Amino acid sequence: MEQRHSFPEAAGVTDLRNILPKDQTVWEILRHTDRPIVLYGTGNGGDKLIDALARIGRTPDGVFASDGFVRSRTFHDMPVRSLADTEKQFGRDMIILCAFGSSVPEVMENMRRLDANYSFYMPELPLYSGDLFDYEYFITHIDEISEAYSLFTDERSRALFRDVLLYRLSGKVCY
């Protein structure tokens, strides 16, 4: 549903601070939304997402799993449902947070399908502990980030750096 943003360098803007407006970063969207927030997946990734949401004063409204993983079970006191049942409960205008990663082609295709049909995010999370890569962290470390960016001289490397930065800020899988 959300569209990929392009870095405004082509328009003459070269300051990385302008790569993505604060209100379009994943943690700001989640902090201020009134839409239901649901987790796709359980386990360690789900635990980490719940912890990250708590840092911004939010809790998930529900959780669903792929059809093969839906059993009579709960995750953090929430019933684990199918996507169809979750959609019946919350409607299509929900925010889906992916709580796991995969390199399995069928799973990746399902994630692309979810991204095309819903507000779908896969936020970067601290592996062990530490700060969220949110807008405040980004601005606090902008000098180091800009210095690293300046080390790349070819456009392909710079574009990749921008895409990684856009992913880290937006949580969008299109990057």
Roles of regions detected by a PLM:
Residues M1-Y175:
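Hydrophobic, well-ordered beta-alpha structural blocks that scaffold small-molecule cofactor pockets
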